[in-house]
Amino acid sequence: MDSSAKTLTEDKQVYRVEGFSCANCAGKFEKNVKQLAGVQDAKVNFGASKIDVYGNASVQELEKAGAFENLKVFPEKLANSSMQAVKEDTKAPKEEKIPFYKKHSTLLFATLLIAFGYLSHFVNGEDNLVTSMLFVGSIVIGGYSLFKVGFQNLIRFDFDMKTLMTVAVIGAAIIGEWAEASIVVVLFAISEALERFSMDRARQSIRSLMDIAPKEALVMRNGQEIMIHVDDIAVGDIMIVKPGEKIAMDGIIINGVSAVNQAAITGESVPVAKTVDDEVFAGTLNEEGLLEVKITKYVEDTTISKIIHLVEEAQGERAPAQAFVDKFAKYYTPIIMVIAALVAVVPPLFFGGSWDTWVYQGLAVLVVGCPCALVISTPISIVSAIGNAAKKGVLIKGGVYLEELGAIKAIAFDKTGTLTKGVPVVTDFKVLNDQVEEKELFSIITALEYRSQHPLASAIMKKAEQDNITYSDVRVEDFTSITGRGIQGNIDGTTYYIGSPRLFKELNVSDFSLEFENKVKVLQNQGKTAMIIGTDQTILGVIAVADEVRETSKNVIQKLHQLGIKQTIMLTGDNQGTAEAIGAHVGVSDIQSELMPQDKLDYIKKMKAEHGNVAMIGDGVNDAPALAASTVGIAMGGAGTDTAIETADIALMGDDLSKLPFAVRLSRKTLNIIKANITFAIGIKIIALLLVIPGWLTLWIAILSDMGATILVALNSLRLMRVKDK
C-alpha cells in the first residue's frame, strides 16, 4: 500500500446519517461533502445510512452539507452507544411509533385541500378565487420541502429530480393549471414516501441482525456470578449460559454439554451438539445444558459483529449495474431539461402551435423525466438480496460479487474440507487371521498408533473411543517410525507392523499374495488409504481410512448442474486414483489431481481464460491464492475462521455446501430483477414521452407514470427478501 492510501485510511471517519429520502439525495450529499475543505474523499453507503469521510470535517460542516435534506449526522460509535443506552434504560420511555397521520400530516392536509378544491371547482367553477386558493394552498403546504431544495438547485444550476419537479410545478402555475400543479406536488410526495418505506424495509434485515446477540452476559468474577454489559467483558472471562438463553459472546466451552441452535450465524436450522473445547458464537441459542464458556474475542470482534460490519460495507459497494445507473442519471436529467425546453418552444416558434398547449406538454416532459424509479432500481435490490443472504448464512461482501456470482460459467472445488469433511475416518477394518480377535487386534493397532505422529492416527483413536476399545493396558516397547512406510513396536515379545503394502512387500511376508494385493487396490481405488497390520511372518488384518465425503456434496453438484453450471471441477493434491473415486462419487464434471497450491492457481487462471467468469470454493486458508485469482472466491465455514470471512468475496457461514445453490439462485434473481427494473423504468418513460407527438401527454399521466414506475420497481426489488433456501 502506498503512503497516500495509508494516510487516507488512517483519516477515515464513519458517521451515521438520518434523513435520507432517496438515493439521489444520498449522492448529492456525498458530492457536497467531497467539496468541504479538509475532506480528501467521501463515500455514502445509502443502504446502511452511513458516510465514510476521509480527512477532517466537523459534524456541523457535514450537517451543513446535508442541509438541503435536513440531514442529521452522528459519529458511528457515539450513535451506536446512544442507541444502546436508550434500549437498555428501563426507566426511559419506549420510543413510540409515530402514527401515520402525524408522520405524513402535511401530505394528508395537502390532499384534503385538493379534494376541497375539486369540490369547489364543481360548485363554483374553475376560475373561482376560492377554488384557486385551495389548490395554491395544497401546492404550498405539500410542496414546501420540494421547493426548498428545488429553488436552491435552480440557483446553483444543479439539476436533479427535485429541480425538474419544481420547474414543472412553477410552469403549471404560471399557465394557470393550478389543479394539475397541486396533483403533481402531492403524487411526488407520495412517491418519495413510498421510496423511503421500501428502503427502510430493505434495511430492516440488517437491523434485525444487530438485535440477535444479547447485550449483557452472566460472568464469573471473584467467585461470584454477575451480570455484565458485553462492552465490559474481557478475553479470558468465564461466561455462564443457562438453557434457553442466547449466547452473548464468542468463546470456547470449558464445561458442559448442550445442543446449540446456530441458525443466526450459519443458517443451519438443526441444533449442533456442543461439548468441551467446542467453539460457540454470539447470537446463537443454547437449547439444553448449562455451559461455561471462556471468552475468546471482544464484542467488536465477534463473528456476528464482523458479519454486520461486512454486510453494511457490502451494501455500500456499488454494483456494476448501479454504477451504470449513476452514470446514466448524471447525463439523463440535463438531457430531459433540454428536450422539455425544445418541446415547449419549437412547435409554437416554427410550426404555429399554441404556446399554452406546448408549454404544458414541455412541463409534462419534465415530470416524466423524473428519474426516481431508475435511481432506486438497483440499491433496493442489492440491499434486499444481501440482507436476505446474511440471514440464510451466506455473507456476500458487495453488490459486485452478487452480480458476478450470477454470471459464473464454472465452479472449481477444493476437495479437502469442501467436498469432503476434511477429517479422516476409519471406513473399513477386516481381520484376516483366525489367531486374533477383532477387538484384540484393534486394541494393538490403537496402542501403536497412539505413539504415532501420522495424520491418520487420529481416525483410529476416534474409532477406538466410539467402540469403547481400551488400549492403555497394552504395553508397547521399542516403538519405531519407519519413514514413508509405517510404524513398528514390540508387544508381549512380538513385533507388530502397521504400514503400506510396500512395507510388507519389503518384509517378504509369506501370505502377501497377488490376490491380497488386488483387494488392497480395490480399497485404494475407492479413495481410501489402506494400511496393513501384521508381523514379519503373517498378515493379521487391513484397515482403511478416508477423508469422508460430505453428505450434501453430491446433491449440491446436481443442483448446480440443474442451474446450468455444467463445468464443476475438483482440485486436489491427492493421487489420481483417490481423486477419481471421490470425483465420481460426487459427480463433478472434471477432476484435477496431484496439484500443488501454485498448480491450483495456474489452473484457475486457465479456467478464466476458457470460461470467463469462474468461482472457486475452498476453506480460505491453504487455497487463498486460487480464491483470490478467481472471479468470485467463496470460503467455507466462515463462522469458524476469521480468515475465511476476511479473504473471500463470499463466505458460507455454515460448514457445508448446501447454501451454494441458494446463493447462485439469489444472485441470478437479483440480476434479473435489476435488469427488469432498469428496462421498465426507462421503457415507461419512453412510452410516456411518445405521447407528446399526438399531444396526449398530460401532467396527470406524467406523474402517475413516474409514481407507478417507482412503486412497481420498489415492490419488485423487495421480492428478493423472500427468496427461500430450498
Swiss-Prot record:
GO CC terms, sorted: plasma membrane
Disulfide-bonded cysteines: none
EC number: 7.2.2.21
Record membrane topology: Multi-pass membrane protein
InterPro entries for the chain: ATPase_P-typ_cyto_dom_N, ATPase_P-typ_P_site, ATPase_P-typ_TM_dom_sf, ATPase_P-typ_transduc_dom_A_sf, Cation_Transport_ATPase_IB, HAD-like_sf, HAD_sf, Heavy-metal-associated_CS
GO molecular function list: ATP binding; ATP hydrolysis activity; metal ion binding; P-type cadmium transporter activity
All residue ranges annotated as the HMA domain in the record: 11-74
GO biological process, one term: iron ion transport
Keyword terms: ATP-binding, Cadmium, Cell membrane, Ion transport, Iron, Iron transport, Membrane, Metal-binding, Nucleotide-binding, Phosphoprotein, Translocase, Transmembrane, Transmembrane helix, Transport
Residue positions of the active site: 414 (4-aspartylphosphate intermediate)
Spans through the membrane: 105-125, 129-149, 163-179, 335-355, 363-383, 671-693, 698-720
Residues reported in the UniProt entry to bind Cd(2+): 22, 25
Localization of this protein: Cell membrane
Stretch forming the signal peptide: none
One Pfam family recorded for the sequence: Hydrolase
Source superkingdom: Bacteria
Catalytic reactions on record: Cd(2+)(in) + ATP + H2O = Cd(2+)(out) + ADP + phosphate + H(+)
Family under the similarity heading: Belongs to the cation transport ATPase (P-type) (TC 3.A.3) family. Type IB subfamily.
Role noted for this protein: Couples the hydrolysis of ATP with the export of cadmium.
Record's protein name: Probable cadmium-transporting ATPase
Organism listed in the record: Staphylococcus aureus (strain MRSA252)
